[in-house]
Amino acid sequence: MLLYKNFSMHIIILFIAIITFTQNTYGEIGKETGLEIPRYVSLKSNDANIRVGPSRNYPIEIKYLKKNYPLKVLEEHQEWRKVEDFKKNIGWIHKSLISGTRTGIIISNDNKTLKLLNTLDGNVVGEIGKDNIVYLEKCKIDWCFVSLGIFKGWIDKNFIWGVKQNEIIKISFFQRFEDLYWKSINTLNEFQKGF
């Protein structure tokens, strides 16, 4: 009887996971590209201007000098994208200056260690300080596998600006269900400990 209850509970958790991941999790759709808004992009060059409005006739508000700098697209207007950086600066950039390459910026107040595994007790492979720009190789629900030069490792999403909290990047379809399953089991176990 106990085995049947455990099996039933696992089936229910799996069913909830399937429903959760098959629902539309997107925000708006951009009228120019058909892509999700908001979404993250990065700069293509070491010299890019953010303008007050969507035209070269508008004054330059900010000048970025760092290739791969992450930006969040908030709106689309013809060839222009309204973007925001991690410091909450907002302006317009021409679409030719941005790329779909996913990068993030470390927002920790101190050095945050990269993890070889996506657990807190994983092997430390290096340390990375705030304001470093990293490539987002892949992301699970709570962790991203990032690279910076020769260093690669897992880091908690809470320390990265440039990825949505529940966003999955380059992870197989079934990995999502496995992660959600184990997260649900852990939550259920914690809940049962309270009784």
Residue ranges and their predicted role:
Residues 56:
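Extracytoplasmic Gram-positive cell-surface binding/anchoring modules and repeats
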Residues 10-20:
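Bacterial N-terminal signal peptides
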Residues 23:
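Conserved beta-alpha structural segments and adjacent helices that either
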Residues 1-12:
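Bacterial N-terminal signal peptides that target proteins for export
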Residues 26-52, 63-67, 74-77, 84-87, ...:
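SH3-family beta-barrel domains
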